[in-house]
């Protein structure tokens, strides 16, 4: 935000003018090999490479994505994320690229509430138009209502950032993000059905390491 003038404000309110939009929900399981070197482990996030007795549900090929049931959190997996990509055009013809990402990460497998909840939520927004970049991030603890998800109706939130819909599916839906420097309010519909990626949602993510994911897109 430092490269923006303090009083400059971007506000986007767009209805049915999404050029391209993709949403993915992913739960990823990572197995670290005992022989991995310190350099190799250093390339993986500190949260994912924790060496402890914590055991999360593995992503296995005999499981599959089932919609609309999987429009929800999957706390048995260590982490998952949702991505919202859009390209919009304002009334002057200026094009803006938008990415909003939302992550849930568990530090261990405990099912506890309040401040003992092991989940961490992170979201970031990036907007660019070729000459400017606007960006902001939010981080929240789980278990205290600061961030979370419901699916009847569908809603992802962290602080005052919301992706919500009237029904149990993400679309048609609304993404509402506001910061001190910029804000956007996007109403979105889809032009086709949801797509389950890979083999019924299962995708191998690394040729050598035991890394796989479940994912779907719109």
Give the residues covered by each predicted segment.
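Targeting-peptide/extracellular-domain and disordered-appendage signature
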Residues: 2-218
